[in-house]
């Protein structure tokens, strides 16, 4: 008797697809996170099987999944935390969907990855958390670009920053008072991106220190700086948005 191997082996969720989702999708597609649906369990993934095939096989253009826009044949190709899919992984997804998206043997399912949604700090529990003002975006609102009020960081002394991470918060409830409801358009959060800096002002309101930080986009990983090149956060800094883009999520 001969077993099925290589390209002829059946592709299953537990053995083949779950590891792909864990590595490349579940950073956003988990409960209470940015994506419009969770893709953790087979029951969650199965209704989206055809959509997953389509969204992962569109090619290197905007809006493909996972969002990773590095050109495959130009420049540096080896990046930490690269979520892009290989040709082999894309082939597995296609074969799995075309074969009816079978579940497979539960024993093949890999251990689950740590889940925390938007409350999980990728770089560990922070030493300092700064909370900006709240925004309410109506369900039928047009896109908005602007600035937010200066927000005191809360540091009373100069500090070198090892890592910085921005989290969005969505506290809009559905009819059942469930903040995890995902019936939205394009995701749970209304933030698209924010260009931000920190500044120190003197008693006359004049800028005496200014530091630029990595632009924030929804789903962005924490930015960790080299120990030899950490950024200085001056005492009594304030967070200043140079440009904030908000959009409705349909709720």
Predicted regions and their residues:
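Aromatic- and Gly/Pro-enriched helix-to-coil junctions and flexible linker segments
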Residues: 1-151, 163-167, 236-242
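His-enriched metal-coordination microenvironments in redox/metal-binding proteins
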Residues: 114-251
């Amino acid at each position: 008797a001969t077993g099925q191997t290589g390209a002829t082996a059946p592709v299953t969720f537990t053995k083949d697809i779950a590891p792909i989702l864990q590595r490349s999708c579940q950073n956003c597609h988990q409960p209470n996170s940015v994506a419009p649906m969770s893709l953790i369990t087979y029951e969650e993934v199965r209704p989206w099987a055809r959509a997953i095939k389509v969204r992962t096989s569109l090619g290197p253009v905007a809006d493909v999944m996972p969002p990773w826009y590095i050109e495959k044949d130009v420049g540096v190709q080896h990046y930490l935390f690269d979520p892009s899919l290989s040709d082999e992984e894309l082939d597995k997804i296609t074969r799995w969907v075309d074969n009816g998206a079978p579940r497979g043997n539960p024993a093949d399912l890999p251990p689950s990855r740590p889940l925390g949604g938007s409350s999980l700090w990728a770089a560990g529990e922070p030493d300092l958390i700064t909370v900006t003002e709240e925004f309410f975006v109506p369900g039928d609102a047009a896109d908005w670009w602007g600035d937010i009020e200066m927000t005191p960081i809360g540091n009373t002394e100069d500090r070198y920053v090892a890592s910085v991470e921005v989290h969005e918060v969505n506290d809009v409830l559905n009819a059942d008072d469930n903040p995890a409801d995902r019936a939205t358009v394009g995701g749970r959060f209304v933030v698209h991106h924010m260009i931000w800096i920190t500044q120190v002002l003197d008693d006359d309101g004049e800028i005496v220190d200014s530091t630029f930080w990595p632009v924030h986009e929804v789903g962005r990983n924490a930015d960790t700086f080299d120990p030899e090149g950490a950024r200085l956060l001056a005492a009594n800094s304030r967070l200043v948005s140079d440009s904030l883009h908000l959009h409705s999520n349909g709720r």
